[in-house]
């Protein structure tokens, strides 16, 4: 089954789909997103955001954490985070965590 495409909002809980992994590549000495026949090399800020995309945190919590860490305007951080996450979702590198049955 193909991963569900999402429309990123502050309430969604993004996570990498099963076919993609965020991994530190020792050869390249940088973080990469590995997917079948594709490799993306995100920058440092994108890596920090992706590490927070664990399916437990919603986008609002990710934005709040980054705004607090960098003492930056939440609205500005929010626009950048939402744009990056939506771009990755549109390319199939992000999906939304689903509720698990108890």
UniProtKB/Swiss-Prot annotation:
Q: In which pathway does it act?
A: Cofactor biosynthesis; pyrroloquinoline quinone biosynthesis
Keywords for this protein: PQQ biosynthesis
Any one of the GO BP annotations? pyrroloquinoline quinone biosynthetic process
Which Gene3D superfamilies does the entry mention? Coenzyme PQQ synthesis protein D (PqqD) (1.10.10.1150)
Q: Which NCBIfam families match?
A: PQQ_PqqD (TIGR03859)
Q: Which family does it belong to?
A: Belongs to the PqqD family.
State the oligomer form and interacting partners: Monomer. Interacts with PqqE.
The record's function comment reads: Functions as a PqqA binding protein and presents PqqA to PqqE, in the pyrroloquinoline quinone (PQQ) biosynthetic pathway.
For this entry, the protein name equals PqqA binding protein
Gene source species: Rhodopseudomonas palustris (strain ATCC BAA-98 / CGA009)
At the highest ranks, the source species' classification is: Bacteria, Pseudomonadati, Pseudomonadota, Alphaproteobacteria, Hyphomicrobiales
């Amino acid at each position: 089954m193909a991963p569900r495409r999402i429309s990123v909002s502050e309430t969604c809980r993004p996570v990498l789909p099963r076919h993609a992994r965020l991994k530190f590549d020792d050869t390249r000495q940088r973080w990469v997103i590995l997917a079948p026949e594709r490799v993306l090399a995100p920058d440092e800020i994108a890596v920090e955001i992706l590490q927070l995309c664990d399916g437990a945190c919603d986008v609002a919590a990710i934005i709040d954490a980054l705004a607090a860490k960098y003492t930056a305007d939440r609205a500005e951080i929010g626009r950048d985070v939402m744009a990056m996450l939506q771009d990755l979702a549109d390319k199939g590198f992000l999906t939304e965590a689903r509720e698990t049955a108890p």
